[in-house]
């Protein structure tokens, strides 16, 4: 009986410690990112940048090709808050997705929590996160849409969360539009500024390769 009672005390103590640690870790990750890393990021993570992305519609991969789709993003830092910047994605569509999406969201730089530090190893990492961005565009039937229809173009529940290394220029983030089950994933990659000059040609090649892939696999 004493053994059972002692075991229960140990379990209770462990649970208390676990939740206390998680709470403390969550408080830490809400803190500002290192100022030097942020300042270093501003000179590179700025303006138009082409990244490879995956897009899903209702959980179905519309990108299909393993290398992803070349996608142009715009990064603009706030002149009011040194820890904030806005990520914009304009006129985004993939193959016969039919839908054209525009999205922008202000994100805040943060430190990584202990779990994230184990996944994103090495110096230079900052986390960025933002919610309730603006989304507008054209649906598959050609009709336009503007956010949730009740609050301008703001989509409550939409979000961006990602990670950037100010030293290696690696980046990874996910855009959740919270509309029609559409998501964009920028998988872990190193930014190459030279891709901007070849964007149109690369996008055309992607579309041609996508059409060939669909024909080969009998995808309509």
Per-region residue spans from a language model:
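Bacterial N-terminal signal peptides that target proteins for export
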Residues: 1-8
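Beta-sheet ligand-binding and adhesion/scaffold domains
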Residues: 122-220
């Amino acid at each position: 009986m004493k053994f059972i009672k002692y075991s229960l005390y140990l379990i209770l103590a462990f649970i208390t410690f676990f939740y206390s640690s998680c709470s403390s870790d969550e408080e830490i990750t809400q803190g500002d990112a290192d100022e030097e890393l942020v300042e270093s990021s501003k000179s590179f993570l700025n303006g138009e940048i082409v990244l490879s992305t995956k897009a899903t519609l209702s959980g179905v991969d519309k990108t299909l090709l393993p290398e992803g789709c070349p996608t142009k993003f715009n990064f603009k830092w706030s002149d009011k808050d040194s820890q904030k910047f806005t990520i914009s994605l304009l006129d985004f569509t993939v193959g016969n997705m039919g839908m054209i999406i525009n999205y922008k969201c202000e994100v805040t730089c943060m430190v990584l929590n202990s779990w994230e530090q184990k996944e994103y190893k090495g110096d230079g990492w900052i986390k960025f996160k933002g919610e309730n961005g603006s989304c507008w565009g054209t649906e598959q039937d050609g009709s336009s849409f503007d956010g949730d229809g009740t609050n301008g173009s703001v989509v409550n529940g939409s979000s961006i969360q990602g990670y950037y290394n100010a030293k290696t220029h690696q980046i990874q983030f996910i855009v959740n539009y919270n509309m029609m089950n559409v998501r964009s994933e920028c998988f872990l990659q190193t930014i190459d500024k030279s891709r901007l000059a070849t964007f149109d040609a690369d996008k055309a090649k992607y579309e041609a390769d996508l059409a060939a892939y669909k024909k080969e696999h009998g995808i309509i």
